[in-house]
Amino acid sequence: MIRISDAAQAHFAKLLANQEEGTQIRVFVINPGTPNAECGVSYCPPDAVEDTDTALKFEQLTAYVDELSAPYLEDAEIDFVTDQLGSQLTLKARTPKCAK
């Protein structure tokens, strides 16, 4: 479903080390299926995990996706890119604005 590069996993692991134990990440889509759709990533503390979430286990972390966002995040890619201007996290999803 979602691919998270090694560089992005390392970046998230570094951030998660400063959070409450057991905190992971959540990948989501706001306003899925509309022209205003936006993808995002946030912290996901243990008490925020829902029974209906999909847990995607990676080498350094687990990413949770809610059931409404899941169809819109098929083949999504998260990367952490560094160049001469600095570093940035990128999230590319092909279908967040398409009706499913």
UniProtKB/Swiss-Prot annotation:
Disulfide bonds: none annotated. It comes from the Bacteria. One of its GO terms (molecular function) is metal ion binding. It holds the Pfam family Fe-S_biosyn. Keywords: 4Fe-4S, Iron, Iron-sulfur, Metal-binding. Binds 1 [4Fe-4S] cluster per subunit. The cluster is presumably bound at the interface of two monomers. Its cofactor is [4Fe-4S] cluster. Homodimer. Belongs to the NfuA family. Involved in iron-sulfur cluster biogenesis. Binds a 4Fe-4S cluster, can transfer this cluster to apoproteins, and thereby intervenes in the maturation of Fe/S proteins. Could also act as a scaffold/chaperone for damaged Fe/S proteins. This is Fe/S biogenesis protein NfuA.
